[in-house]
Swiss-Prot record:
Belongs to the PTH2 family. Its EC number is 3.1.1.29. It holds the Pfam family PTH2. It is found in: Cytoplasm. Keywords: Cytoplasm, Hydrolase. This is Peptidyl-tRNA hydrolase. The keyword Hydrolase applies. It catalyses: an N-acyl-L-alpha-aminoacyl-tRNA + H2O = an N-acyl-L-amino acid + a tRNA + H(+). It is an enzyme of class 3 (hydrolase). One of its GO terms (molecular function) is peptidyl-tRNA hydrolase activity.
């Protein structure tokens, strides 16, 4: 079973490269911390497998908040580790703006049901 983490970023916000990098990092760290603090043994199994595999991370894009929310809701429905990132609003965008979501680490075939059709950022 191969695993991966996917971060889905909104492109309608016109964030700079550094801002996007920070938001993606927030999502990745948040996912790992959420799993470590969770009682979900399956998620922890996926996390440890992902760590053994070299922590594959993929960053993809969506054009809108609506599309991001659809992906988030589908990940929740499939009971995958999922996080949603809201910006603090200290630099480029308004406080509370949802910038990206993170999904996984989880089996590739499950994550691909949600993000497999999206283009790389």
């Amino acid at each position: 079973m191969a695993t991966k983490m996917v971060i889905v970023v909104r492109t309608d916000l016109d964030m700079g490269k550094g801002k996007i990098a920070a938001q993606v990092a927030h999502a990745a760290v948040s996912l790992v911390l959420d799993i470590l603090n969770s009682s979900n043994s399956l998620w922890k199994e996926w996390l440890y497998k992902w760590l053994e595999e070299g922590q594959p991370k993929i960053v993809v894009k969506v054009p809108s908040l609506d599309e991001l929310n659809k992906r988030y809701e589908k990940a929740i429905e499939l009971n995958l580790p999922t996080t949603i990132i809201q910006d603090a609003g200290k630099t480029q965008i308004e406080p509370g703006t949802i910038t990206c979501i993170g999904i996984g680490p989880a089996p590739v075939e499950l994550v691909d049901k949600i993000t497999g059709d999206l283009k790389l950022l």
